[in-house]
Curated annotation (Swiss-Prot):
Protein name: Phyllomedusin
InterPro entries attached to this UniProt entry: Tachy_Neuro_lke_CS
Record's subcellular location: Secreted
Coarse class of the protein's main subcellular location: secreted
Coiled-coil segments: none
Family from the record: Belongs to the tachykinin family.
Database matches in PROSITE patterns: TACHYKININ
Pyrrolidone carboxylic acid modified-residue sites: Q1
Function text: Tachykinins are active peptides which excite neurons, evoke behavioral responses, are potent vasodilators and secretagogues, and contract (directly or indirectly) many smooth muscles.
Methionine amide: modified positions: M10
Expression (tissue specificity): Expressed by the skin glands.
GO CC annotation, single: extracellular region
Biological processes per GO annotation: defense response; neuropeptide signaling pathway
Species of the source: Phyllomedusa bicolor (Two-colored leaf frog)
Length: 10
C-alpha cells in the first residue's frame, strides 16, 4: 500500500 493513501484519509 502507498503511504500517499494514508494522506488521503487526512
Amino acid at each position: 500500500q502507498n503511504p500517499n493513501r494514508f494522506i488521503g484519509l487526512m
